[in-house]
């Protein structure tokens, strides 16, 4: 659809061709002419990878953008965007423009720096040399303005590669792009400068994860979503989005210097759109061109405008001072007036170097159909769409509906036994469930501080044949909970949807199918302000539940804590017109305050209510009975309650819909209408004459109507689903699933999957989970995966929000609480000392780490914590208690390493950039003052349990088969002031053994109860892994500080060093007691390996050496003879049979596994990022469950406390193998060894 006015054609063609005709001798922009960048300039460096987002870059002054003047931080992404707010992970790749966040996009494409060759640098620069150069660029593009910036954000994408995707386009192999964006700001305005060196853009398209093909890069700006509650797209401007225009970025300009593009992005002139510079390349000031005599043929020159509707927009000649302004009138197409956002495929593009400006104003979008625009300004519009019929639209109807064609289109209608609008149908009389989210920003009483809550769950249950709805909204703060009690209509809308229908009248679901938008305004009489309620119903989801999103904003009167609210039955008139329903009423409610001095004062209050409901109605069926213009909703048995302990708000109402009546709604009405029929909850009530009625079981149930039973269609009709299927019965219905290796065809039958290899989207990164810092992608087999938010975040896994742990006031009153992504910290206020959970008057003495940190920063003149650390300078990190953080990293090089409690580097722990070593803290957290925690063991009940360590305690998690009984998890043992690392279990004496790296020591405790005991506390460095030989009655452990492996009897006596050479960071250790083998891991960064030997130390050899990263945990399953390990470097779990050393990958894509144990078909491992115990099913190679303890700290060792020992014996099982001291089993024999500290007169060594 092109505007063909000859005048517009001539002007635009001339504007697009001028840069070609007038190109002068201006030279190309070289890489050396970019703004200085790199570590030497103090730049920060974005993490290598795909789809990464930087932390917030705090700005010294505000950035202005469109109509905003308060942007104090920006975010830099891998994909060529500078964002004015943190981008959601699902929008971090191309294909979603305009995004919901504010964006400056000099080259929006799917870029990749995983190989480490490409880099993204960014900084804010206040130096005069940089700000002056930015000012010169702006003056060149806008010579008439006076602009002197005080700061500049400089972002450089250097040698970044295109994301290739599975297709691996050979044309893009080895190609890399370099470009730069500078955002310069003064007190009154901001400008963007884009720089593209002549050889900087070697590719112009990238593979789209969303579209599965190559898409062009985009040069654009977007205001992002606007509005607090009801979001809508703000203004946005696109300057290049096809291959030809992107190719010419380095060849042309709008500022007079080739490869340099300047835009005014924040000032009073940019409220509705970004203003580009318009200095034509190669022209001289004062040049004039005749606009009247030239004409061009559009057959050879094509316009570069997208067919997207806006309000009338003036296109000026692309030179300052142009006299002619050409306005394209906009014609609104009624058929598409409610489109959510500007739509329409791009028209053919211009071949000119000049980029056409496309502006999209913040407004309700309009899509415009324009056929011809003549010189007279008359616009002719037409609709070329053919009539829609059931033949190609049957899928728009419910499976329980029929589709019928009419003269102007098609309509859907539910079949007998179902109710709805045809697009959505549910069984008559069947209970319904509604799920959704609630967010709000509410001022209570006269408070000037709003109560804000987000992502709050709403659940509703509806007994349809009674018209009664029960709605619960969880985690509502008590500061606002009681004050929301009068707002029963928040849940009342659900009651209207499923109100009992009287003959000839329809409830909300019959009219809308549960797909509509509702906005209501509540005005409280005698109180200032009002409350706006916005709700969007999105129909039935894949689980058969209706979905709703609710947003509340405004002010409500304060209701005292502990009050009750009573609402009398009421009626409300609903007025209907095409696709719109309105109602208004005045309601009273009684507030009874808590009893004081023997009296409970009550007062009656009033509010006025207005609401509008909009929905999509099928208008093609002229024969359908007209809906009454007015219907009366009768509501009684209104119940409202706020549970202060559970923080749950509850509403319950009974609803019926019918004609306008005066007096009691119950008078002389049929029991079906007033809910006194007594039918089963899975039955429909059929009214008869006067007060007669019958009960009829809903479809999928059978019975007499007063009692209904579910029909098991799968048992009664074994072939109902067809071949290669599994039938699953559900209440009132059934579902069919294809067996493994089959998938549903378009005809609904299961057909074999042909030549389709499953894709692990978690491994390839093509999933839609939130960023790894907030969520994890869990591979579930085949091509399936699930998304789960990490601890400290909430959401559906695709979008995770930080949980504000400071909200419940967890810190001491004399401490500050700092909420951080996924966690929080407490810090005592000045003049107090403590850990933040307990603060007492006094100044705390600084630790060695804090002194060293202050000394280094002071010597470098970098004492301002808001400024970045100077490049090349290493500054140690201290933990919350002032001790050296166990993991230290160099900010410039990216290398990380472990340190001991004195800050000294631990040999063999240094990792390359992008990998973090699994360092252990050697300092226990301080003990909080308060009631003493008993250290006695809490006896375990019978059965098999998982035992895992969490800093200063050991917890138990019962197993039922392979299922974790998470609700029964409890503490087994508290050992304050210790950091327990390794765990092992003796199935004979039912004793658990552990290593502690703080004292250091090795201890044990009985599962039957009693006090724990320390069995070894001398000559230890950093004991980590520990293993038990339950047949030989020995323990083995690794020591990563002394670099050795030792053995001793179970009581800690008779110690002997087995190995003290060729060990760097030994950690996990396990025994194969029956065969007399020992296995251990060494995560030496230079040479990670898994080794084995006999238990006597002979026959030592490397078992696994290739393709290891950070092998942490190790487990041996005596029942299957399988050795498995978890690797925090490769993020894999792997297994092998030591007698047949062919490895197999159990699962990839783990987060940060630490320790592992086995039981049955499962591995169970602790994960540092998830702070969870994760179950991995080896049979299907996927994570099946996860347990997250209430206390969110790191989990360490894990072991299985078996209810009985595995069968088998070795040569040390009986009479200690005839040895005087240590009996150490070997395959088919044993070796008698003496302890290191025993002279030979009473000890005999023999084989």
Swiss-Prot record:
GO molecular function: calcium ion binding; collagen binding; extracellular matrix structural constituent; laminin binding; laminin-1 binding; proteoglycan binding
UniProt KW Calcium keyword: yes
SUPFAM superfamilies assigned to the protein according to its UniProt record, in alphabetical order: GFP-like, Growth factor receptor domain, Thyroglobulin type-1 domain, YWTD domain
Gene Ontology biological process terms in this record: basement membrane organization; cell-matrix adhesion; glomerular basement membrane development; positive regulation of cell adhesion; positive regulation of cell-substrate adhesion; positive regulation of integrin-mediated signaling pathway; positive regulation of muscle cell differentiation; regulation of basement membrane organization
Modification Sulfotyrosine occurs at: 289, 296
Record keywords, A-Z: Basement membrane, Calcium, Cell adhesion, Disulfide bond, EGF-like domain, Extracellular matrix, Glycoprotein, Repeat, Secreted, Signal, Sulfation
InterPro entries: 6-blade_b-propeller_TolB-like, cEGF, Cueball_EGF_LRP_Nidogen, EGF-like_Ca-bd_dom, EGF-like_dom, EGF-type_Asp/Asn_hydroxyl_site, EGF_Ca-bd_CS, EGF_dom
The protein's name: Nidogen-1
Function: Sulfated glycoprotein widely distributed in basement membranes and tightly associated with laminin. Also binds to collagen IV and perlecan. It probably has a role in cell-extracellular matrix interactions.
PTM comment, free text: N- and O-glycosylated.
Listed GO CC annotations: basement membrane; collagen-containing extracellular matrix; extracellular exosome; extracellular region; protein complex involved in cell-matrix adhesion
Primary subcellular site in the record, as a coarse category: secreted
Subcellular location: Secreted, Extracellular space, Extracellular matrix, Basement membrane
One Pfam family hit: Ldl_recept_b
Residues of the Thyroglobulin type-1 domain: 846-919
Entries under SMART domains matching the protein: EGF, EGF_CA, G2F, LY, NIDO, TY
Keyword Protein transport (UniProt): no
Domain Nidogen G2 beta-barrel: start-end pairs: 430-667
Glycosylation sites: 922, 935
Sequence ranges of the LDL-receptor class B repeats: 990-1032, 1033-1075, 1076-1120, 1121-1162
Subunit-level organization: Interacts with FBLN1. Interacts with LGALS3BP. Interacts with PLXDC1. Interacts with SVEP1.
């Amino acid at each position: 659809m092109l505007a063909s006015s000859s005048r517009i054609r001539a002007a635009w063609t001339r504007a697009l061709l001028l840069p070609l005709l007038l190109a002068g001798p201006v030279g190309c922009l070289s890489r050396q002419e970019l703004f200085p960048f790199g570590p030497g300039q103090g730049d920060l460096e974005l993490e290598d990878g795909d789809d990464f987002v930087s932390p917030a870059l705090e700005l010294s002054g505000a950035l202005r953008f469109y109509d905003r003047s308060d942007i104090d931080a920006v975010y830099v992404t891998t994909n060529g965007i500078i964002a004015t707010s943190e981008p959601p992970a699902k929008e971090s790749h191309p294909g979603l423009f305009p995004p919901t966040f504010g964006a400056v996009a000099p080259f929006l494409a799917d870029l990749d720096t995983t190989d480490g060759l490409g880099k993204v640098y960014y900084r804010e620069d206040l130096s005069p040399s940089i700000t002056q150069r930015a000012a010169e660029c702006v003056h060149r593009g806008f010579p008439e303005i006076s602009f002197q910036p005080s700061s500049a954000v400089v972002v450089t994408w250097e040698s970044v590669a295109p994301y290739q995707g599975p297709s691996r386009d050979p044309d893009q192999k080895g190609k890399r792009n370099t470009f730069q964006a500078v955002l310069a700001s003064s007190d009154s305005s901001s400008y963007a400068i884009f720089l593209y060196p002549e050889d900087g853009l070697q590719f112009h398209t990238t593979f789209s994860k969303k579209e599965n093909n190559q898409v062009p890069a985009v040069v654009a700006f977007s205001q992002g979503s606007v509005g607090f509650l009801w979001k809508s797209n703000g203004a946005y401007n696109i300057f290049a989005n096809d291959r030809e225009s992107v190719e010419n970025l380095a060849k042309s300009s709008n500022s007079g210097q080739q490869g340099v593009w300047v835009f005014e992005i924040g000032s009073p002139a940019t409220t509705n759109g970004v203003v580009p510079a318009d200095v034509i390349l190669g022209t001289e000031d004062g040049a004039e061109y005749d606009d009247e005599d030239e004409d061009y043929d559009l057959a050879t020159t094509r316009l570069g405008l997208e067919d997207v509707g806006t309000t009338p927009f003036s296109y000026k000649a692309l030179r300052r001072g142009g006299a002619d302004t050409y306005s394209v009138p906009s014609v609104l197409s009624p058929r598409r007036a409610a489109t959510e956002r500007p739509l329409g495929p791009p028209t053919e593009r211009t071949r000119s170097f000049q980029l056409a400006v496309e502006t999209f104003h913040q407004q309700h979008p309009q899509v415009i159909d324009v056929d011809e625009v003549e010189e007279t300004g008359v616009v002719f519009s037409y609709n070329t769409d053919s009539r829609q019929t059931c033949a190609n639209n049957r899928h728009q109807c419910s499976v329980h509906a029929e589709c019928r064609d009419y003269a102007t289109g098609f309509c859907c209608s539910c079949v007998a036994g179902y109710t709805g609008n045809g697009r959505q149908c549910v069984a008559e009389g069947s209970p319904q469930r509604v799920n959704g989210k609630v967010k709000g920003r509410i001022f209570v009483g006269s408070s000037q501080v709003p109560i804000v809550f987000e992502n709050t769950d709403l659940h509703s249950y509806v007994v349809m044949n009674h018209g009664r709805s029960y709605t619960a909204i969880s985690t509502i703060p008590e500061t606002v909970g009681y004050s929301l009690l009068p707002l029963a209509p928040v849940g009342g809308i659900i009651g209207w949807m499923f109100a009992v229908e009287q003959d000839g009248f329809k409830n909300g679901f019959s009219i809308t199918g549960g797909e509509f938008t509702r906005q209501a305004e509540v005005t409280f009489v005698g109180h200032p302000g009002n409350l706006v309620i916005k709700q969007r119903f999105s129909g039935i989801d894949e689980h058969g539940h209706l979905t709703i999103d609710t947003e509340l904003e405004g002010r409500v009167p304060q209701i005292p804590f502990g009050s009750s609210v009573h609402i009398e039955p009421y009626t409300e008139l609903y007025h209907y017109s095409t696709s719109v329903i309105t109602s208004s009423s005045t309601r009273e409610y009684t507030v009874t305050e808590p009893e004081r001095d023997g009296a409970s004062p009550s007062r009656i209050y009033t509010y006025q209510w207005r609401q509008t409901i909009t929905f999509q109605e099928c208008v093609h069926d002229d024969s359908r009975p007209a809906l009454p213009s007015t219907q009366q909703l009768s509501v009684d048995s209104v119940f409202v309650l706020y549970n202060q302990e559970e923080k749950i708000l509850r509403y319950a109402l009974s609803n019926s819909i019918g004609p306008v009546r005066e007096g009691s709604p119950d008078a002389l009405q049929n029991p079906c209408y007033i809910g006194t029929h007594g039918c089963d909850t899975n039955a429909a009530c059929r009214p008869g004459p006067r007060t007669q009625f019958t009960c009829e079981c809903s479809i999928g149930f059978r019975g007499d109507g007063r009692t209904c039973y579910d029909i098991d269609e799968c048992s009664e009709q074994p072939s109902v689903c067809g071949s290669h299927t599994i039938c699953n019965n559900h209440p009132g219905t059934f579902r069919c699933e294809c067996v493994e290796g089959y998938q549903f065809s378009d005809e609904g039958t299961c057909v074999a999957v042909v030549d389709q290899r499953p894709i692990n989207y978690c491994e390839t990164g093509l999933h839609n989970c939130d960023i790894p810092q907030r969520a994890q992608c869990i591979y579930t087999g085949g091509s399936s995966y699930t998304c789960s938010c990490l601890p400290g975040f909430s959401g559906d896994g695709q979008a995770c929000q930080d949980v504000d742990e400071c909200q419940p006031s967890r810190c001491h009153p004399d401490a500050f609480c700092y909420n951080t992504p996924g966690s929080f910290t407490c810090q005592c206020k000045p003049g107090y000392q403590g850990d933040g959970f307990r603060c007492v008057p006094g100044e705390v003495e600084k630790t060695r780490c804090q002194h060293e940190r202050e000394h280094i920063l002071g010597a470098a003149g970098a004492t301002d914590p808001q400024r970045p650390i100077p490049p090349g300078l290493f500054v140690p990190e201290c933990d919350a208690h002032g001790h050296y953080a166990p993991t230290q990293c160099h900010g410039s090089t990216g290398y990380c390493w472990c340190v001991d409690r004195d800050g000294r580097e631990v040999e063999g722990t240094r990792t390359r950039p992008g990998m973090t070593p699994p360092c252990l803290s050697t300092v226990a957290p301080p003990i909080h003052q308060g009631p003493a925690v008993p250290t006695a063991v809490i006896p375990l009940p019978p059965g098999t349990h998982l035992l895992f360590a969490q800093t200063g305690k050991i917890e138990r998690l019962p197993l039922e088969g392979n299922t974790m009984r998470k609700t029964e998890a409890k503490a087994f043992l508290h050992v304050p002031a210790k950091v327990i690392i390794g765990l092992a279990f003796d199935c004979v004496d039912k004793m658990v053994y552990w290593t502690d790296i703080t004292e250091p020591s090795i201890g044990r405790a009985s599962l039957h109860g009693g006090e724990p005991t320390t069995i070894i506390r001398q000559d230890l460095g950093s004991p980590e892994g520990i293993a038990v030989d339950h047949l030989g009655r020995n323990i083995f452990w690794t020591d990563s500080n002394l670099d050795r492996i030792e053995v001793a009897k179970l009581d800690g006596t008779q110690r002997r060093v087995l190995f003290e050479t060729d060990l760097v960071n030994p950690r996990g250790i396990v025994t194969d007691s029956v065969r007399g083998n020992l296995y251990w891991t060494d995560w030496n960064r230079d040479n990670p390996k898994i080794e084995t030997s006999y238990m006597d130390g002979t026959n030592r050899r490397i078992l696994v050496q290739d393709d290891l990263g950070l092998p942490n945990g190790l487990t041996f399953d005596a029942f299957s003879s399988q050795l498995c390990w978890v690797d925090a470097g490769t993020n894999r779990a792997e297994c092998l049979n030591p007698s047949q050393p062919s490895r197999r990958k159990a699962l990839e894509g783990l987060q940060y596994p630490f320790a592992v144990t086995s039981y049955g078909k499962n591995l169970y491992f602790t994960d540092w990022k998830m702070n969870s115990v994760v179950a991995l099913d080896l049979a299907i190679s996927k994570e099946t469950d996860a347990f997250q303890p209430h206390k969110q700290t790191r989990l360490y060792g894990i072991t299985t406390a078996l209810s009985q020992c595995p069968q088998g014996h070795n040569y040390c099982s009986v009479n200690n193998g005839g040895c005087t001291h240590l009996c150490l089993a070997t395959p088919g024999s044993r070796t008698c060894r003496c302890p290191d500290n025993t002279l030979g007169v009473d000890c005999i060594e023999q084989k």
